Amino acid sequence: MIEAVIFDWAGTTVDYGCFAPVKAFMEAFAHHGVPVTMEETRKPMGMLKRDHIRTMLNMERIAAEWKRVHGHEATEEDVDAVYAQFEPKLFSILDQYAAPKPFAVETAAKLREMGVKIGST
């Protein structure tokens, strides 16, 4: 008998495709004068957010553009500055990407009805 089910909510049962963080990362970089592509933004998906930003800042094209725009290679202060734009942007748009995937709500309700515990990551 199944006793528990663990759901990975963000990007799996809601916001399938992780569009909210992708949009927030792209807007945070654009705010600092360095537009990034969706492909560049998606490459480090799954990392902690600051590590994601740091990884993007070390990508060859982004690093060169950052240096051209800001006159220096990206520093930890720059990671903090991009993150400071990213986090509030993400929270301001989450509701636009919060619709559950088809059958996610029904599945959770059925599991509860069956007495199966539900956890999340």
Labelled PLM ranges:
Residues 2-117:
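N-terminal helical cap/lid subdomain that shapes the substrate entry/recognition surface
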Residues 119-121:
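Mobile, glycine-rich extracellular loop/lid and propeptide segments
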